[in-house]
Amino acid sequence: MDIDPYKEFGASVELFSFLASDFFPSVRDLLDTASALYRDALESPEHCTPNHTALRQAILCWGELMTLASWVGNNLEDPAARDLVVNYVNTNMGLKIRQLLWFHISCLTFGRETVLEYLVSFGVWIRTPPAYRPPNAPILSTLPETTVVRRRGRSPRRRTPSPRRRRSQSPRRRRSQSPASQC
């Protein structure tokens, strides 16, 4: 079965393929962040959001994986085989867990739409040849102000007039109006 853990959140595994494995913080740092920011909601018996539930599940999966890794470490006598298992878990499973934790913590911190925009913006940025892209990659925490990929609709901020258009210092002349048109 090919299950995409991001599908119900509007993302996909492919969106993460543009982010290097060293982009994601360590599992320990992510767990510390989740605990510091969302401990009450994660430990609450009440349902908060789908992101909280998914984050809870990812944390539980990591705990089970660490239990298995400890068992393997204690019971597998061949050091080469033990190293292979530990390396596989850290490289493959560790990356998947780090991606999941990062995604759900980021959604809770910045909002799902912002995180999705970031993933799309970064994917566009990284695929654009260096000669044609801005020098700096999109940054998640500043994305709403700097993103190139915008949602349809009006921009929430007002645009200021172009600095090239200077207004005259003299008062503006008004056309004379007929008395009938003044209300």
Swiss-Prot record:
It comes from the Viruses. GO terms for cellular component: host cell; host cell cytoplasm; T=4 icosahedral viral capsid. Residues 136-183 are annotated as: Disordered. It holds the Pfam family Hepatitis_core. Residues 149-176 have a biased composition (Basic residues). It is found in: Virion; Host cytoplasm. Residues 177-183 are annotated as: RNA binding. A motif (Bipartite nuclear localization signal) lies at residues 158-175. One of its GO terms (molecular function) is structural molecule activity. InterPro entries: Hepatitis_core (IPR002006), Viral_capsid_core_dom_sf_HBV (IPR036459). Phosphorylated by host SRPK1, SRPK2, and maybe protein kinase C or GAPDH. Phosphorylation is critical for pregenomic RNA packaging. Protein kinase C phosphorylation is stimulated by HBx protein and may play a role in transport of the viral genome to the nucleus at the late step during the viral replication cycle. The modification Phosphoserine is found at S155, S162, S170. SUPFAM superfamilies: Hepatitis B viral capsid (hbcag). GO terms for biological process: microtubule-dependent intracellular transport of viral material towards nucleus; symbiont entry into host cell; viral penetration into host nucleus. Sequence repeats lie at residues 155-161, 162-169, 170-177. HAMAP family: HBV_HBEAG. Self assembles to form an icosahedral capsid. Most capsids appear to be large particles with an icosahedral symmetry of T=4 and consist of 240 copies of capsid protein, though a fraction forms smaller T=3 particles consisting of 180 capsid proteins. Entering capsids are transported along microtubules to the nucleus. Phosphorylation of the capsid is thought to induce exposure of nuclear localization signal in the C-terminal portion of the capsid protein that allows binding to the nuclear pore complex via the importin (karyopherin-) alpha and beta. Homodimerizes, then multimerizes. Interacts with cytosol exposed regions of viral L glycoprotein present in the reticulum-to-Golgi compartment. Interacts with human FLNB. Phosphorylated form interacts with host importin alpha; this interaction depends on the exposure of the NLS, which itself depends upon genome maturation and/or phosphorylation of the capsid protein. Interacts with host NUP153. Belongs to the orthohepadnavirus core antigen family. This is Capsid protein. It comes from Hepatitis B virus genotype F2 subtype adw4q (isolate Senegal/9203). The gene is C.
